[in-house]
């Protein structure tokens, strides 16, 4: 009986004690950011206060914090607040948003167009044999001996579109071109930037020969305009209502050779290219609306630039492969804006009029992958291509298509026919041991094409044999 009474007393006393503890906890609890937190979580109050001040300092950060809290149920918010796991991701998201805001002023407005550039990626910096060469290698126009007119459409699914027209021509070893691109949002999307860029190109080829096809040097001058406030009030808050005029320049270098070629063709099969892209300035034209907090009081920014090295090789007629590496940097923020990208590509040409291409490249050591696959149809006068691209870092799907027409090809073919016909006539004279006639014919070949090395080599050999025959004749005449 005594033990039972003691137990009842203890149980009743314990109930009173529990009630007292609950009351104390209720008395010591506080409300932070709309959530009631007990005394076990009071040590997190400075972190919440810091997050709240960050949201007050940046309206963008405040919106992000509100969206994150709205997505998480109330019981999970309390549990995460007590455990202390909800603060760090939110602060990181707010900081990332602020960094994205600052990055608007550094963009160089390099609009992806499509064509072989989209199909082959970084390796196309070495080839640069399509109307999409403007953003790949400024030296590409020197390799076009005909008039090329192209049009491209580049679409990020449910996001934005880019339309491009390009014109390329050459006079002798000097090429020139013009490209204009316009970017606009998807019809049902808001908050997307609009803009456009015009590119003026000139390039020249040096040391062109029969086996060594020469070195080309070219430059681009780009003038662009971007309006990040075209998507409505919501986008003005996110991007600061910024409008920029961007002026940049590119310098490109390309070398081409015929090396270890296992098929008959007069075109090169080894390409090496390098380029420095988007060296210039981005000028904010509505700085009064954005304030100094967006760009540290500066309205002029150095654009993000790139340095690319690439090579491509075609050992056999139906297969081409290439690789490239890109270094992206910003001269004003070199320590924080400095990364590498690298990739590989291949092109299959099973028949004369159809080609299949693909490329994959990665950014640094991250798992972000961009992969493309495309098909190309070509004839004597036109080339059509279609490419699909997937970007894992943004989870975006991209479709691009293009068409290009070749004009004044008859002039080139007529000249090639005259050169080879003249060279073959010289070979017939050479085979008949009529060396003087062969030399005269090959000199006429060089008048049509001064870089045709077989004719020059034939003249050297025929001259040596002619001198040898004269020495033999003189020897027999004297004896």
Swiss-Prot record:
Q: Which UniProt keywords apply?
A: Signal
Segment forming the signal sequence: 1-49
Entries under Pfam families matching the protein: UPF0164
Record family assignment: Belongs to the UPF0164 family.
Protein's recorded name = UPF0164 protein TP_0865
Identify the species of origin: Treponema pallidum (strain Nichols)
